[in-house]
Amino acid sequence: MSMTKINWYPGHMKKTKDMIKENMPLIDIVLEVVDARIPLSSKNPDIPKFAKNKKRIIVINKADLVTKEEINFWKKFFKENNFADEVLELSAETGFNMRALYSIIDKVSAEKKARLMAKGLRKVNTRLMIAGIPNVGKSRLINRIVGKNSAGVGNKPGFTRGKQWIRIKEGLELLDTPGILWPKFESEEVGMNLAITGAIKDEILPIDDVACRLLDKMMEMNMKNILKEKYKLLDEDFDQVTGAIIESIANRMNMRQKGNTLNVQQATYTVLRDYRNGKLGKFGLDRDLAETMINDYK
């Protein structure tokens, strides 16, 4: 599949990019949210370009959807390659490890306050920007930080519209930004990983190809047994191309439509939805990119 089929950079993303650049001089801390299943593919390479000389925190969200070993690999990777000042895993959905994030934010805020008050300033505000790609969990994270539903929450890419300044507490303000991708993905694999995890709208995707690529990856990781158990597949179902395996899933799960024909589209969306919801096991998709793509993201 060519990259052009899965690029998604509508006009509002260009406007958001310009807005982020415009507001960056006001910001003290840039908190970039990435998806634990695709920490590198979900890391917008434009953010470091905008955030030079800022305190940078990478939050690996959705940590509950991968193994601890996977998390440790990416924390070490980001730290050793100087991607950020701090790297932290959490789950905005469950609240896991939120206290650690609060501590980091408070520490950076206190450092700025002490520095400026030593110069005679009496009132010091710290401003935090939350940035990331669509559907990575920014709004849920903000709700955790603020403690109320001030940002709204959606489970589709592109939910948050326009910038939002949110007062967290005295002396600490947060700028929420809509999720943005970038004009051209560095590789076909990056685009495909974004599509598999739901960062790109399904409506514009060659969805059959996306589901097939997910199954290919699961085969490469020897995860056939999970598919067998989840979808009642037999060994013989795997002696065929992945497109036919999806047909077998429709057959074994009795997914049928008018005329009693197999509903392959239902099977396709079911496989993707199950992975996105963590029902096909805890695993990531990005390991192969760690060495080959590193310079594109720093």
Predicted regions and their residues:
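Canonical P-loop GTPase G-domain recognition
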Residues: 64-131, 150, 255
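Short, structured loop/turn "capping" segments at alpha-beta junctions
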Residues: 112-116, 143, 149-155, 221-226
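Helix-rich effector regions associated with P-loop NTPase G domains
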Residues: 1-29, 37-38, 43, 50, ...
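Glycine-rich phosphate-binding P-loop
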Residues: 127-147, 151, 177
